Curated annotation (Swiss-Prot):
Residues 781-794, 853-863 have a biased composition (Low complexity). This is Interference hedgehog. PROSITE patterns: FN3, IG_LIKE. Disulfide bonds join C65-C127, C173-C221, C276-C324, C367-C415. Residues 731-907 are cytoplasmic. GO terms for molecular function: coreceptor activity; hedgehog family protein binding; heparin binding; patched binding; protein homodimerization activity. Residues 1-23 form the signal peptide. The chain crosses the membrane at residues 710-730. Residues 42-149, 152-233, 252-340, 346-433 form the Ig-like C2-type domain. Residues 24-709 are extracellular.
Length: 907
């Protein structure tokens, strides 16, 4: 085997090793210490949810729903107040047109629902905004009818009070049932009192501070429904008598029939007044204290009044028991215990989080909320209540358990907390990885099936299984482009060579267009990074789309057997025109850290942490600054991420980076370009090669190798060093071989042979390759000619003995030094001129010393030279003839050869 072939085989053996080493280098690697982040939401939220309303019959109520980004379309759901428990149903546009009580209008990111207040329209309403396959639901708005009615217990109730001057009189007018809460009007001697002269609350209590003789008279009240304007006059009356003369001293006490509120409810942020009723003479003074609310009485938010304690900007920590002491120096003092309950709207403290979940697995979603009264928690799965899902169970603490996650659960999962004061919601994006069915058991959606013959070997069936990628997640990049993200789970199926992206436009008429395939081949080994649990993510963009159109996308995987299989189809995606979209926050690249020779760490920030609610993640773009090629892309999930490591870079190279935030329906503008450099290679002496044990275990093709960058560089450098050593050895061996084949005493013979091409002829025994040898004619001294004749005679005798056995021989050519003989080169000659020269030599040898000759053929010894050297060749008539072909590329150095300069022609 020649040296060249050995070297080629060596390279072939080394190439797979180098390829495997290079493939083991991770392309993208997550940050070593990432900050904990919640699962990404859909990137959209309800900015303005419909509000609960109380209206009189026949009025028109408008519910308004506004989203942060324009959805694909709006829907409204309704649950009648007559159904227990309430069951929501969607209000279709067709039914809304037929029903004159309901009208639905949409305008970009705002939807309005107009409802005529009637008994059949009372209930709860929700707004549902659809963003492709995601349904984001608003909080519930209640529609109630205004009403007011009196309490029969207070009928014909009259009070007669005699009070000393200077006291504060608190009179409770009566109790009414009103929705909404009524406003109160008081009358003194049947004349309405101005509001500024009275102090009252929503419970119908009249406060008359520092009464005097002028305060004596008859008092009554009227309750008015603020929504309908209906007035209700209560029959209760107060006959108050304030003597002008002084009365006897009395201890503080309650008047006959006077009420004391021992429990007060107030909302956080409002101003509350705790009343301390009681009269005496002299008028008593109130002293306040609280055993379980330290510092609540004497602070900048409280004010002690003669008739009560006023607390402004109420906070939950103000809740507790308050004690009022009425004392005028006469024992016993009057004591009241009042419990203050601070009500608060619900607020979710711990929203649910969800990651990629395999179909059939068990999942628990947690949701913790606060509020007063204690909020009730319920769940919606893509707008549908979890109560009607057989796989869902809500435990007493409010958490939701999905015993077996199904594909229908994929989408937006929302947790709602509500009480009498309001409602609050939070959600998360739930992604479901469907089960991989064996070949032949699909649902008919996969068109790329393997054409291999079925086999009974289970092992072989697993090896030929083609595991498809996941359905792509779609994000808007511009008016004409989207970004697709998909993943491949670790498996034992066939290796994937590359991906193709397919998309299809959906028309309003429902007519489907054919699938379009992009031109780009997305290699399996490019643009990937690990997201944990053996999942490899991929990213690609699709351009040339039409705005305000709906599309579906899917990923086609091409495997090592040149067969293909497609992923599940994405949900319907509506490509919204950018002018109608609210801009997302643009991340700011703060620093690019030189992490290693092949990796850098990006650090960025947002202008406000509140922008995280609209963001699902970030796209990182990078390329060498000296290149104008396409940017490489990386996907960073999680709005709370603030750093990310990008590896597999060139050592000591400057790169340019830019970031872009994205949500489910849009992407932000690019951040400003920022350059960063990887660490330069460290200058060190060449270490001695160290042999390491090689693990021959072949990993799965979908398995990621997380190698240290220093180890990766060492392996690559060692491989290059081995290649350099082999190349040097090859060059040295080839040089020695060339020296052995070209002796120094025949420097021009090879050049002469290159100028002639032999013609193969058929031998009686076997085909032979004919060689032509042309030797220079001796034109030098007689001594040199005689020495040459002796050498030729010896060669002739040796080869003549071999001729009888071989049937063919090739005479060793006689070589003369052309420079010594004075030749400058060879002249171009045809085969006929060669034969004439040969015959001339023969006649010269036969004629002895006849004639003068320039070639010294008349010298003694010429005849013997011709007979001994040339005649055996000329007389070998039984040998096949030689035909000499002249090459068209005869070099110029042979153009000086004359017809008389040839000594012999070997045939």
């Amino acid at each position: 085997m020649s040296l060249t072939r050995r070297f080629s085989l060596t390279l072939l053996l080394l190439l797979p090793l180098l390829t495997s080493l290079l493939a083991a280098i991770p392309v993208l690697q997550a940050n070593l210490s990432p900050a904990p982040s919640s699962s990404p939401g859909p990137g959209v939220r309800i900015l303005r949810a419909p509000e609960s309303t109380v209206a009189p019959p026949g009025d028109e109520v408008v519910f308004v729903c506004e989203t942060s980004l324009p959805p694909e379309y709006f829907e409204w759901s309704y649950a009648s107040s007559r159904s227990h428990p309430p069951r929501f149903k969607y209000l279709k546009s067709s039914s809304a047109k037929a029903n004159h009580n309901i009208t639905i209008t949409h305008n970009n990111d705002i939807s309005k629902l107009r409802v005529i207040v009637r008994p059949e329209t009372l209930g709860e309403y929700r707004c549902v905004a659809w963003f492709g396959p995601l349904a984001v639901t608003s909080t519930t708005a209640r529609l109630e009818m205004a009403s007011i009615s009196g309490d029969g217990a207070d009928t014909d109730q009259r009070a007669h009070w005699r009070v000393a001057a200077g006291n504060t009189v608190l009179w409770h007018c009566g109790q009414v049932a009103s929705n909404p809460a009524p406003s109160w009007s008081f009358y003194y001697n049947d004349n309405e009192m101005p509001p500024a002269s009275t102090l009252s609350d929503s419970n119908g209590t009249l406060l008359l501070p520092h009464v005097s003789a002028a305060s004596s008279g008859s008092y009554s009240c009227v309750a008015t429904n603020t929504a309908s304007g209906v007035r209700l006059a209560l029959p209760s009356r107060l006959e108050l008598q304030v003597p002008a003369a002084a009365l006897a001293s009395t201890a503080p006490a309650l008047l006959n029939g006077q009420r004391v509120r021992t429990q007060v409810f107030a909302k956080a942020g409002e101003t509350v007044l705790l009343l301390c009723p009681g009269v005496g003479y002299p008028p008593p003074t109130a002293v306040w204290s609280s055993p379980n609310v330290p510092g609540a009485v004497y602070n900048n938010r409280t004010r002690v009044l003669p008739y009560g304690l006023q607390i402004s900007a109420l906070q939950p920590l103000d809740a507790g028991t308050y004690i009022c002491y009425l004392d005028n120096g006469i024992r016993p003092a009057l004591e009241h215990f009042i419990e203050l309950v601070v009500q608060k709207s619900p607020r979710i403290l711990r929203p649910p989080t969800a990651n990629l979940t395999n179909e059939g697995e068990r999942m628990q979603l947690e949701c913790e909320a606060t509020g007063m009264p204690k909020p009730e928690i319920y769940w919606l799965l893509n707008g549908e209540s979890s109560v009607y899902d057989v796989e869902a169970e809500q435990v007493p603490n409010g958490h939701l358990i999905l015993h077996s996650v199904q594909k229908r659960h994929a989408g937006y999962v929302q947790c709602f907390a509500r009480n009498s004061l309001g409602e609050h919601s939070a959600g998360t994006l739930l992604q479901v990885n469907p089960k991989q069915l064996p070949d032949g058991e699909g649902t008919g959606m996969d068109s790329g099936r393997s054409s291999a013959r079925p086999t009974h070997s289970r092992k072989q069936k697993q090896q030929t299984q083609m595991v498809p990628p996941s359905a792509p997640n779609v994000t808007r990049l511009s008016d004409e482009s989207v970004m697709l993200r998909w993943h491949v789970v670790r498996n034992d199926g066939l290796p994937i060579q590359f991906f193709k992206v397919q998309y299809r436009m959906l028309t309003e008429s429902g007519k489907r267009k054919s699938w379009q395939t992009t031109n780009e081949n997305i290699p399996y080994g490019r643009q990937r990074h690990e997201s944990g649990a053996g999942v490899r993510n991929f990213t690609s963009s699709v351009t040339g789309l039409k705005p305000n159109s709906s599309y579906r996308f899917r990923i086609m995987a091409v495997y090592s057997n040149n067969d293909n299989k497609e992923s599940n189809t994405s949900g319907k995606f509506f490509l919204q025109r950018g002018a109608a979209l609210a801009p997302l926050a643009v991340p700011e690249l703060v620093d690019i850290e030189e992490y290693s020779q092949t990796a850098v760490v990006l650090h960025w920030r947002l202008s406000s942490d509140a922008d995280e609610q609209l963001i699902s993640g970030y796209y990182a773009y990078y390329r060498p600054s000296a290149s104008a090629g396409e940017y490489l892309k990386a996907t960073i999930d999680g709005a709370k991420s603030r750093s990310f490591q990008i590896s597999a870079l060139e050592p000591g190279t400057i790169y340019e980076f830019k970031l872009q935030s994205f949500s489910a329906v849009a992407a932000s503008e690019f951040s400003a370009l920022k350059q960063g450099r990887t660490q330069r290679p460290r200058a060190s002496s060449t270490p001695q090669p160290v042999l390491h044990a090689v693990d021959t275990t072949t990993p799965s093709h979908n398995e990621t190798f997380n190698m240290n960058p220093m180890l990766t560089g060492t392996i690559g450098g060692g491989a290059l060093l081995v290649l350099l050593v082999i190349s040097a050895c090859l060059c040295l061996c080839r040089r020695r071989s060339s020296r052995g084949n070209n002796p120094q005493h025949k420097p021009r013979l090879a050049e002469l042979r290159e100028d002639f091409v032999p013609l193969n002829t058929c031998s009686p025994n076997k085909p032979r390759t004919r060689h032509i040898h042309i030797t220079l004619n001796p034109l030098a001294q007689q001594q040199q000619q005689q020495q040459q004749q002796q050498l030729q005679q010896q060669q002739h005798d040796e080869k003549e003995a071999q001729d009888n056995d071989m049937g063919y021989f090739q005479r060793q050519p006689v070589v003369y030094d052309a420079e010594t003989l004075g030749f400058n080169g060879l002249a171009r000659m045809s085969s006929s001129s060669l034969r004439r020269s040969q015959r001339t030599l023969e006649r010269a040898a036969a004629g002895g010393g006849s004639g003068g000759n320039n070639n010294n053929l008349n010298q003694p010894g010429d005849g013997s030279l011709a007979n001994s050297a040339d005649s055996p060749r000329l007389q070998a008539s039984n040998k096949p003839g030689r035909v000499i072909l002249k090459r068209a590329r005869l070099s110029s150095r042979s153009e000086n050869l004359s017809s008389g300069s040839l000594n012999s022609v070997g045939v």
